[in-house]
Every structure is written in structure tokens, then in C-alpha cells.
């Protein structure tokens, strides 16, 4: 709502004052506190507020900018009209056919009637822009009239904040509906080019058109849903024109608005400021904006109502022409940077797990939000959504671009930066340790050791386990030293096809494979690698595939009646449990009979990741742990992948029903935002390092151990997972929550070109039936490229394709993505 003098009339209060509960005082501001309301609806509402929407597509043929204000009544509409006025003049002068229109969109407007045409208080913003932005000089200069397309998408009569107007008037609009209206409007406004015009158009140059989307109030003013509009519009991430505050106190509000936008990942193309009372607020803002490369444009104060603004606009035409040129230069530079990355990325990067000689098309990721990347498409000159089907290498836990997470990280960076950890304590690390021990470590762990990533977490775990084994068995550590001619050998009991990371120690806990045989001359497999029984959907039913080495003379198992039956504890008394026990015991005993010590057991519980996405029969792993425990062999759970709701439960321990001695967590630990890992251990394990000699301490460490930003990210992520868990309705129907449509995967498993499928928690897996299966297989490469062209950023493990979401993703979204996946796969098969 436009108020010329940028002052507010005093209105009587619309509500009586109410007493709100006072939250407990906190001396830190990381993490989230669950709602104190006990109703399920309140819990669900808080859960819904955690999630970020996906990405909305829009064309880059015509530059589009979003106008935010550092407050209400500071001249957003006045500035918008000036920019549109300048753009119409430029468009008329150049007579561009394909540059697109000049347009102004007001998504939400209060203080007008529902049609947006009759103002209750003052003039509607769209009407104001339409009046002052038209080309009044066309008759004298003989230029073609270039109109401004002005529209209001949703409005209320009451001149208050949208959330309050919606409440008072009894009609509202959801954020999803608002974004859909806006995206559709932007699509309609884009120029409809002929093939000839598309060929002639320079995608790296801004046309003469320009579209402005003006927000309501300040940067964090709410939409009708009470969510900050800076969060709601983040799904588009349009570059911003920030209108600063020229009044007394406006320096602070302008700076705060700028920081609120930056922390949410917006690009600020320009700041416009209507100065008041000759305060020169721009001069105070300029040192910071200059550092950020953001130009500031200033205008003189506007005359008071009811004096018209025609002369004011004429006096400022040159300023607005500069603003418009700057915005178009920003747009052009953005497109040129996309092109530069597309051309040069492969020449400067060395991508992991990539054969550069066969690298495919580079995806230019402009940003990410929710479960999707915002990717630049040079062929259509658009930014479009691409579902992050690999959860950015299995890390995504709270959605990309989550503003609550961004705020927590900024707070920790501002309060601490990085501080030394040994013999020190800081709030983020202390709070995180308490949360870890009260959740995944509850009942068994007492110590938390921090490191950098999953691989190093497992390295630490192996050092812990071997020390525990050596002392428990009253051995001398020196007998395992590499400089001893007759040194004893100590190895790890692990699973065939396992993968625990890329550092040398954990590389050695893996069989010879494509992951290690040409990677390091010091690689030596130091383990007993047990083949594991695998669970999958085949021909529509859950089957357990048991290698003959395990099964012996045991008859083939009948298909299980349901997925939940896989985790039924009554299977512990089945004949199959005895078969598993005999196999594990024989593997350990036969190894130790040769004089080799089995000093630790290391397993990926339930789901093995990089080795091929295999669901391991939990009965087998439970038996393995029991056999190791009977022999005082420390057991490590590598939950780097499986931990923190990846499998639909907090920890794979919840599905196995048996505790480890040591466990490793990463990836989802920090919500997928920053790298960090934690290795949890029991007090018995800790005590094996508790001695008088420094040399007997755990001499392992990283420069950024327990860095505050990482700990703050983890605390925030764990709080979000807790809120998610609180909002769920307990059910006895399913032991494991699955986000993906099992019926679709069961049907897929009946196809002749599919070897197996399954889904557990946030993971869905489809293995193609091929002759040369394995990680080195290229059979899925064509399908991967087809999926990426059709909105799904998938990766594969050889012939095994998978999709992964975050714990905050809705099942409806998963169904949408899975449908797209299956459709593209079936179309490709039909062509063969």
C-alpha cells in the first residue's frame, strides 16, 4: 500500500492485548525449540514450517527483479514506477521486437478492493505504477508508445499486514498458490519468439524489456501464512532491488534488510534510497555496499500529497536511467558468467569419482532450494528445477537453502568463527554432545569424538576398536608394529562389497575393487570379508538372496509376506538364524586358527551404500554382532550413510535391536550443509586410552575438530529431526517409514529389464538387469542423461540407480519424482 509521505496514520488497535507465554531464556541462539503446544496440529504446523519449497522455473529472456524494502512506507512503489518509466522509454527508443515487455507485478496488496482497482486508503500500487511509468513524451518525440503491464495477484481491503488482513476478512491465499500465480504470470509475460527470432537472439544480452515484482512491507514481513516473504519468494530467487530507508533510523533498518537477504542467498543487484531531511543515509551504507559490489542510487525526497509527482520523475529520469542500465548490466553479466562456467568448468575442476574423458554435460547450478537444484539451461535460456535425486551425495537432511539453518550457521560464525577444541568447551559442541548421547548413543555411549567427515570418523573408530581388543585380550601393541619381522597381524571383520571411505586405513577395510586397486600403491586388504544375505523386491515379493557359501545345505527361503516381516525379532529363533551363526563363527574361528587376530568388526548396518545399495538381512547382522561380542571383538557401526532418519528411523540400531561399541555419524548429522563427523564410544572403549602416558592417549585430530559452525549446524538439524519425529502419529502398521511408493517399486520389480528394487526410509533403489553388473558398468549412463534432461538429477552405482530425499520431504513429492523416474525409464526401454 502506497503512502506518499512515508508516514503512518495512527489507527486504533485491531486486537486487545493478550498475554503470550514467555519462553525460557537462552544464552545461545542455535537450534530450534519444539513447540510447547501439546496438540498434534501444533506439532504438524511447526514441522511444516521447517521445510523449504522446491525451485520455480523462470525465463531469462527478459530481466526480472524483485523489489524488497527495508521497511514499509519507504517508497518501493515510487522507485518501481521510476524504473518501469525508464525501461519503457528505453524500449520505445530502441523499438525492440523480442526484448519482452515492461511489467510490474504486485503479488500481495492490502488496502484495495478484491479486484485491485479501487483503493480504500490512497491509490493501489499497480495503478500508481501504471500512471507514472507510461511514456508521456511519445507525442512530442514521435516514439512508439510502450505500455507497462501492471497487475495485482491477490488483495485485501484492510490496510494492514497480509496475515492480519487475511484473518480479519476471512479469505486467504497459501504460499503455494501465491507462488504458482506468480510463476504463471512471469511465464505469460515472457516474449513468445519465433524460431527465427530465437536464432537471432543473443542469450547473453539483456533485452529492452524489464519485469519488477514488488513485495509488501519489509524483507521479513509475512505473507498470509505468516511466513517471512523473503523465505516464500526464495523458491524463485529473483535478483533484488532493495529500497533502503532514508529516514532517521533507516541506516540500521537498511543494513538489517540487506543482511536478511544475503543470509537467504539472494543476489542484491542495486539499492535505491529516497533521502529524507538531508540525512544522507546512503553515505553511511556505502562502505559496506562497496565491499559487496552493490551500487547505491539516491533520489531526493518526494513532495507531500496531494502534489503530483510528474515533475519529481522528470527531475529524476537520469537517475532511474542509470538504475535501469545497471540492472540490465547485472542481468547480462549473470548470463555471461553462466556461459563462462559452462565452457571452462571442465578445464579447471578435477571432479571426484569422474572419468573426465567421458564426462557428460556440465550442470550449471545457480542455487538450490528444498529438494531441488536451480539449473541454468542454455538451450532455453531459463533456470529450471532439477530434483536432487542423490541428495547431494546422500547428505541432504533439512533441504537446500533452509533459512533457519543459515541463521544458525551465521550466528555461530559471528560468535566464534573457529576456536581450538582440545581441553576447551564451547556451547555448540557441548550441546551437540549431549544431544548425541541422549539419542543415537542412548543406553550405550558416553563419549563423543569429533572429526571432519565419514572416512575420518571410521579411521578414529578403528583406532578405538583395535586398542580395546588389544587390551581386552592382554596383548602387547608393539607386536603389531610394522617394523617387527615377526609381527602379528590384526584385521577387521567386514562385509563383502563394503565401502567406508577414501583414507588409507579404511580403504584397507575393503576387498580389491574399482574403488582401490588403481588408487593407492599402499592399499592392502586387511580384513575378512563376509558375503551377506540381501533383501529386495523381486517379481513383486520380498526375497532374501543367500549366497551358497552361507546357506550350505539350507533350503531356499520362502518370500517374506511384507517388508516389516524382515525386521520381526521372532526370526531370531528361526533355523536361518542358526545357519547365519554357523557361517559367522566359522569365518572368525578359521581366521584366528591361522594366528591372525580379528581385532574389530565393521559393518554398514541395514543398508550398504557405495558397494551397490544392498539391503542386508538384519537377522544376519544381529547374529554377527552377537558372535563378535561373545569373543570380545569390538563392533563398529558405520552409520555415516544410514544414521539420522536416512532409513526412516533415527538410527539403524533401532532396526537391528542391538547396540554397537562404537558408531560413526556424518552426512545427515549436519543436515547436509557443512562437513563434520562424530564417533561415539562406550566408556569401556574410552577407558582403554585413559592412562598416565601421553602416548597412550588417542593421538588423532583435525584442525577444525568440533568447529562451532559445524556443531551449530548439527544441533539445528537434530532439533529439526526431533520436531519431525514429534509430529508423526505413532502407528503399529509399519515398523519402518518409507517415503517412496512401494506399490510402484513392486510393479517395477516384475519387469524383465529390472533385477531388483526396494525402498527404505528416504531411499529408493532400482537395479537394471545387465550382463556386466557392478560399479564399472555404463548401462545406466543413457538413462541418467535422459533423467537430467527431464528434471531429475540422478546418479548411479554402475547399473544400480537410486533416488533419495530428505527426512523433511513429503510423500507426495516423492511420488511425483518416482513417477517421473519410471516414465522416463519405460520410454527409454520402449525405444530399445
Where are these regions (language model features)?
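Hydrophobic anchor at the beta1->P-loop junction of P-loop NTPases
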Residues: 67-68
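N-terminal mitochondrial targeting presequence
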Residues: 1-60
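Conserved catalytic-core segment of NTP-binding enzymes
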Residues: 208-210, 215-293
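Conserved N-terminal phosphate-binding loop of PLP-dependent enzymes in the Aspartate aminotransferase
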Residues: 332-832
Amino acid at each position: 500500500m502506497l503512502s506518499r509521505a512515508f508516514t503512518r496514520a495512527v489507527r486504533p488497535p485491531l486486537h486487545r492485548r493478550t498475554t503470550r507465554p514467555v519462553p525460557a531464556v537462552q544464552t545461545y541462539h542455535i537450534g530450534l525449540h519444539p513447540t510447547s503446544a501439546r496438540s498434534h496440529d501444533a506439532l504438524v504446523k511447526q514441522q511444516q514450517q521447517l521445510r523449504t519449497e522446491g525451485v520455480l522455473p523462470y525465463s531469462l529472456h527478459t530481466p526480472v527483479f524483485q523489489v524488497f524494502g527495508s521497511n514499509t512506507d519507504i517508497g518501493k512503489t515510487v522507485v518501481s514506477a521510476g524504473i518501469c518509466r525508464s525501461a519503457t522509454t528505453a524500449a520505445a527508443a530502441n523499438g525492440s521486437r523480442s526484448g519482452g515487455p515492461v511489467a510490474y507485478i504486485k503479488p500481495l496488496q492490502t488496502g484495495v478492493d478484491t479486484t485491485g482497482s479501487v483503493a480504500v486508503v490512497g491509490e493501489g500500487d499497480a495503478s500508481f505504477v501504471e500512471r507514472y511509468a507510461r511514456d508521456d513524451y511519445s507525442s512530442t518525440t514521435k516514439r512508439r508508445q510502450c505500455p507497462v503491464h501492471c497487475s495485482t495477484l491477490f488483495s485485501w481491503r484492510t490496510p494492514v499486514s497480509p496475515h492480519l488482513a487475511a484473518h480479519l476478512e476471512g479469505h486467504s491465499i497459501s504460499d503455494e498458490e501465491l507462488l504458482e500465480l506468480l510463476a504463471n504470470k512471469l511465464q505469460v509475460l515472457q516474449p513468445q519468439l519465433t524460431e527465427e527470432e530465437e536464432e537471432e537472439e543473443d542469450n547473453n544480452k539483456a533485452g529492452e524489456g524489464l519485469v519488477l515484482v514488488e513485495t509488501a512491507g519489509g524483507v521479513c514481513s509475512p505473507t498470509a501464512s505468516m511466513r517471512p516473504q523473503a523465505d516464500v519468494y526464495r523458491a524463485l530467487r529473483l535478483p533484488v532491488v532493495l529500497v533502503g530507508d532514508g529516514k532517521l533510523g533507516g541506516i540500521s533498518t537498511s543494513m538489517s534488510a540487506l543482511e536478511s537477504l544475503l543470509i537467504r542467498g539472494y543476489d542484491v543487484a542495486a539499492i535505491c534510497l529516497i533521502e529524507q531531511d538531508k540525512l544522507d543515509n546512503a553515505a553511511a551504507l556505502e562502505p559496506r555496499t562497496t565491499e559487496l559490489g552493490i551500487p547505491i542510487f539516491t533520489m531526493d525526497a518526494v513532495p507531500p500529497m496531494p502534489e503530483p509527482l510528474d515533475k519529481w520523475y522528470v527531475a529524476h529520469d537520469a537517475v532511474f536511467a542509470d538504475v535501469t542500465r545497471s540492472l540490465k548490466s547485472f542481468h547480462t553479466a549473470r548470463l555471461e558468467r553462466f556461459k563462462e562456467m559452462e565452457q571452462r568448468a571442465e578445464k579447471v575442476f578435477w571432479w571426484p569419482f569422474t572419468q573426465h574423458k567421458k564426462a557428460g554435460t556440465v550442470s550449471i547450478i545457480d542455487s538450490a532450494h528444498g529438494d531441488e537444484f536451480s539449473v541454468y539451461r542454455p538451450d532455453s535460456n531459463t533456470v529450471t528445477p532439477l530434483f536432487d535425486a542423490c541428495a547431494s551425495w546422500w547428505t541432504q537432511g533439512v533441504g537446500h537453502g533452509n533459512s533457519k539453518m543459515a541463521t544458525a550457521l551465521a550466528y555461530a560464525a559471528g560468535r566464534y568463527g573457529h576456536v581450538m577444541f582440545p581441553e576447551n568447551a564451547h556451547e555448540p559442541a557441548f550441546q551437540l554432545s549431549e544431544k548425541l548421547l541422549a539419542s543415537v548413543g542412548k543406553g550405550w555411549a558416553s563419549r563423543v569424538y569429533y572429526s571432519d567427515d565419514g572416512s575420518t570418523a571410521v579411521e578414529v573408530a578403528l583406532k578405538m576398536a583395535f586398542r580395546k581388543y588389544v587390551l581386552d585380550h592382554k596383548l602387547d601393541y608393539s607386536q603389531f608394529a610394522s617394523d617387527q619381522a615377526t609381527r602379528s597381524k590384526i584385521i577387521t571383520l567386514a562385509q563383502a562389497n563394503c565401502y567406508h571411505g577414501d583414507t588409507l586405513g579404511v580403504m584397507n577395510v575393503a576387498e580389491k575393487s574399482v574403488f582401490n586397486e588403481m588408487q593407492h600403491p599402499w592399499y592392502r586388504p586387511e580384513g575378512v570379508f563376509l558375503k551377506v544375505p540381501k533383501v529386495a523386491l523381486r517379481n513383486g515379493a520380498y526375497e532374501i538372496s543367500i549366497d551358497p557359501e552361507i546357506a550350505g545345505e539350507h533350503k531356499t527361503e520362502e518370500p517374506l509376506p511384507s517388508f516389516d516381516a524382515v525386521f520381526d525379532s521372532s526370526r531370531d529363533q528361526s533355523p536361518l538364524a542358526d545357519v547365519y551363526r554357523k557361517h559367522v563363527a566359522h569365518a572368525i574361528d578359521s581366521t584366528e586358527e591361522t594366528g591372525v587376530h580379528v581385532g574389530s568388526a565393521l559393518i554398514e548396518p541395514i543398508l550398504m551404500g557405495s558397494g551397490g545399495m544392498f539391503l542386508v538381512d538384519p537377522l544376519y547382522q544381529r547374529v554377527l554382532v552377537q558372535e563378535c561380542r561373545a569373543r570380545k571383538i569390538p563392533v563398529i557401526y558405520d552409520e555415516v550413510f544410514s544414521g539420522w532418519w536416512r532409513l526412516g528411523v533415527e538410527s539403524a540400531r533401532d532396526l537391528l535391536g542391538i547396540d554397537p561399541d562404537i558408531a560413526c555419524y556424518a552426512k545427515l548429522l549436519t543436515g547436509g550443509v557443512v562437513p563434520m563427523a562424530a564417533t561415539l564410544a562406550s566408556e569401556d572403549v574410552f577407558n582403554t586410552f585413559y592412562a598416565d602416558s601421553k602416548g597412550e592417549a588417542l593421538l588423532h585430530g583435525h584442525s577444525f575438530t568440533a568447529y562451532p559452525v559445524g556443531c551449530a549446524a548439527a544441533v539445528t538439524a537434530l532439533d529439526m529431526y526431533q520436531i519431525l519425529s514429534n509430529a508423526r502419529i505413532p502407528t503399529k502398521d509399519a515398523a519402518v517409514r518409507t517415503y517412496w511408493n512401494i506399490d510402484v517399486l513392486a510393479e517395477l520389480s516384475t519387469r524383465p529389464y529390472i533385477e531388483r528394487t526396494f525402498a527404505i526410509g528416504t531411499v529408493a533403489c532400482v537395479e537394471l538387469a545387465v550382463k556386466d553388473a557392478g560399479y564399472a558398468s555404463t548401462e545406466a549412463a543413457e538413462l541418467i542423461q535422459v533423467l537430467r534432461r527431464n528434471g531429475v538429477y540422478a546418479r548411479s552405482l554402475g547399473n544400480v540407480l537410486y533416488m533419495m530425499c530428505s527426512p523433511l520431504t513429503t510423500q507426495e513429492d516423492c511420488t511425483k519424482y518416482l513417477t517421473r523416474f519410471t516414465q522416463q525409464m519405460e520410454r527409454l526401454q520402449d525405444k530399445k
